[in-house]
């Protein structure tokens, strides 16, 4: 009597592993079969899977960034905020950035029928351990090439924040003014007190942001977005 081996359905699709070289379609197919997996990214055709997240070096800074961006979103109709949303950038790149801001109507990105971001959001934020992280190298090049207009990287262990603005195909660092305030050039009124954020003073971060939200530039931006929605 012969028997036919039965292969469990869960084993017919190989699991994702760090370093796998995959197409975006195969990456998505495997990722969807691993619902327990919270974060995996495809960068230049290579799979990167996140390690367990530490509190002080990632989870808390991440939450502070989301709080900062959430206040901006609340005051800016027509702007949408994503937290760890998968982004289909191109055939070799599907990152899952810590945070993103996108212009809903008339912006660079869209929401697909299956509810993914497609195209480059206007702003992406990543929390990185240090300058050795792939957030500062491979991802930076991918975001630049796909025309993410602004890219903010918080290098936690080096206590530094780099805010890049795309100009003529290259990323140029935005520098703080004499008061230590950094200002987005894509999202008027999105002001950041760099030192307050690095010190974990979310209250001061939000106070400075509120000042940006009270400017004429922000009011004009809101009027423009409102007109796009009408």
Segments from the language model and where they lie:
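Gly/Pro/Ser/Thr-rich low-complexity, intrinsically disordered segments predominantly at protein N-termini
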Residues: 1-230
